[in-house]
UniProtKB/Swiss-Prot annotation:
Involved in the development and function of nodules. It might participate in the biological process of symbiotic nitrogen fixation. GO terms for cellular component: peribacteroid fluid. This is Nodulin-25. GO terms for biological process: nodulation. Keywords: Nitrogen fixation, Nodulation, Signal. Residues 1-24 form the signal peptide. It is found in: Symbiosome, Peribacteroid space. Changing I245N: In strain: cv. Cardinal; clone 910. It comes from Medicago sativa. The sequence shown is that of cv. Nagyszenasi. Disulfide bonds: none annotated.
Length: 246
C-alpha cells in the first residue's frame, strides 16, 4: 500500500512537468516575427557601424569644420546683434543732433531743387503772354491786313509800300494815290482826277457819282456784274451805278 501511494505521487509529478512544458511551448509567440525584427535592427546597426568604420574623421577635420562654422555663426550673430541694437537701443546723446542736421540738409536740398524747377518750368501760356507784352512794348508795329491787300486799287503813279505782301500785290497805275489806313483803302474809289481823303468821317460821307465810277475796280470786286454788252442783261449798268452810289 505504501509503495502504491509513492508511485502515484511520482506519476502525478511527471504529468505536471510534461503539462507545463506543453503549455509553455503552445503559448510562445511566433518566432518568425521576432527574428525578422531582430534581423532588421542588426542590419541597420551594421550599416551604421560600417560607415563609421570606413570613413573615420581625420585629425584636423573637426577643427576646420568648427572654424568655418564658427566664422559663419559669428557673422550672423554680429548682423543680428547690430540690427537688434539699432532697432531696440535708444540713440546716444549725440545721435539726435547728427540726425537733425542730416535731415535739415536733405530738406534744404529738396526745397532748392523744387525752387529751381518752379523757376525754370514756367507755364507756356505765361511765357507767351510775356513775349507778347515785350513785343508790344518795343513800339508801334505796322501790320498789313488782308482787307487792305484784297481791296487794293491800282493807279499809274508810284506808291510807297512797307510790307513784302504789298509789294507782291502791287499793280502800277497812271496817277499817284495816297493810302493811309485800311478804312480809306476800302472806301477809296479812283477817278480821272486825284482826290484826297483826310478822315474817317469824310470817307463815310463821301458818295461818288455815276461819272466817278471806276468800272475796272467794280469788276474786280464784283466779277459777276458786267457792263452792258451784246450778250449781257439790260439794266446791269444801272445796277452797277446804284451799287456805286450806295
Amino acid at each position: 500500500m505504501v509503495y502504491s501511494n509513492t508511485y502515484m505521487l511520482l506519476g502525478l509529478g511527471v504529468f505536471v512537468l510534461l503539462s507545463s512544458h506543453v503549455l509553455a511551448y503552445n503559448m510562445r509567440a511566433d518566432p518568425s516575427i521576432h527574428d525578422s525584427t531582430l534581423d532588421d535592427q542588426k542590419s541597420n546597426d551594421f550599416v551604421k557601424t560600417a560607415s563609421i568604420a570606413e570613413c573615420p574623421p581625420g585629425p584636423d577635420t573637426y577643427l576646420e569644420l568648427s572654424d568655418s562654422t564658427l566664422d559663419d555663426q559669428k557673422s550672423m550673430d554680429y548682423v543680428k546683434d547690430a540690427s537688434t541694437v539699432d532697432h531696440n537701443c535708444p540713440p546716444g546723446p549725440h545721435t539726435y543732433l547728427e540726425l537733425s542736421a542730416w535731415l535739415q540738409e536733405e530738406q534744404n536740398s529738396i526745397d532748392k531743387v523744387k525752387k529751381v524747377l518752379r523757376t525754370d518750368e514756367a507755364p507756356d501760356n505765361q511765357k507767351g503772354l510775356e513775349y507778347k507784352d515785350a513785343r508790344h512794348n518795343d513800339g508801334p508795329i505796322e501790320i498789313s491786313t488782308r482787307t487792305e491787300k484784297d481791296n487794293f486799287i491800282p493807279s499809274d503813279g508810284p506808291i510807297e509800300i512797307s510790307t513784302r505782301t504789298e509789294n507782291e500785290n502791287f499793280i502800277p497805275s497812271d496817277e499817284p494815290i495816297e493810302i493811309s489806313t485800311g478804312t480809306e483803302k476800302e472806301n477809296f474809289i479812283s477817278s480821272d482826277e486825284p482826290s484826297e481823303i483826310s478822315s474817317g468821317a469824310e470817307k463815310e460821307n463821301f458818295i461818288p457819282s455815276v461819272s466817278q465810277v471806276d468800272w475796272r475796280t467794280f469788276h474786280a470786286k464784283y466779277p459777276w456784274i458786267k457792263k452792258d454788252g451784246p450778250n449781257t442783261v439790260t439794266g446791269s449798268r444801272k445796277l452797277l451805278n446804284d451799287i456805286a452810289i450806295k
